[in-house]
Amino acid sequence: MKLLYFAWLRQKIGKAEETLDPPASVATVAELIAWLKTRGPGYADALKNPKLVRVAVNREYVQGDFKLKPGDEVGLFPPVTGG
């Protein structure tokens, strides 16, 4: 699974992208975020409030209950605001 991090998520996690193989118990977006938070302090800080993180799977916005598949591309980024 390819993960892409944008804006302040990228800064806190310390990388723009990575390829990971989550455990079989990670089936949904919410479970992926919970698992990522266990990968270190940068992840835990960036993902501490999931309401501040938008997720796109294969370039489509999804909710936390969205079922993931091997090979998905998952983008995590802050909500877009207007000005």
What are these regions (language model features)?
Residues 1-82:
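Ubiquitin-like/PB1-type beta-grasp interaction modules and other compact soluble beta-rich domains
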